[in-house]
């Protein structure tokens, strides 16, 4: 390179050369390519469907909904999760490639909602099954809140370090596909209903004369019929 070209190089270098690290480049490439797997089971998912319209422009963040967990890196759970659905949710999460993220949308997903008070089949929070990155409360959350949750997740991704990501992949494993749910005895024995329900007297408490008299009358009625 001769000396005549140096002034031109000095003028164009600040605008054409970018100094960065491999970690920042990896985070930047994933910010606008989050492909979510939509796991909607209740009314919260109806609010999420509003994002697909032109008013909120769901595609401007690079979010492309996928139907296969092997092509997704974000799972968005919305609605109640029951014990019967829990193994399926865990299996979907395990089939997603790394790095992967979870957004819990709605009160029913975060705490079980109104179904967790006396329901024996409702999971009290999806974070008992899979690790959650962003909690989105509401019943149901508005579409603006969903966009805010996605923005916060993008900020979290932009600050990640490669070493911390590998460490979290090994630590944030609540359950695996080999986990089996054991059926335990119910704590609801129904003893509180014994005072209200009518308890028929046993045959030992009925006098012998009345018992045989009732039995003979039933037998004669059966013979007549």
Swiss-Prot record:
Pfam families: Oxidored_q6. The gene is ndhK. GO terms for cellular component: chloroplast thylakoid membrane; respiratory chain complex I. Binds 1 [4Fe-4S] cluster. [4Fe-4S] cluster binds at residues 43-44, 108, 139. This is NAD(P)H-quinone oxidoreductase subunit K, chloroplastic. Its EC number is 7.1.1.-. NDH shuttles electrons from NAD(P)H:plastoquinone, via FMN and iron-sulfur (Fe-S) centers, to quinones in the photosynthetic chain and possibly in a chloroplast respiratory chain. The immediate electron acceptor for the enzyme in this species is believed to be plastoquinone. Couples the redox reaction to proton translocation, and thus conserves the redox energy in a proton gradient. One of its GO terms (molecular function) is NADH dehydrogenase (ubiquinone) activity. It is found in: Plastid, Chloroplast thylakoid membrane. Belongs to the complex I 20 kDa subunit family. PANTHER family: NADH DEHYDROGENASE, NADH DEHYDROGENASE [UBIQUINONE] IRON-SULFUR PROTEIN 7, MITOCHONDRIAL. It is an enzyme of class 7 (translocase). It is a peripheral membrane protein. Transmembrane segments: none annotated.
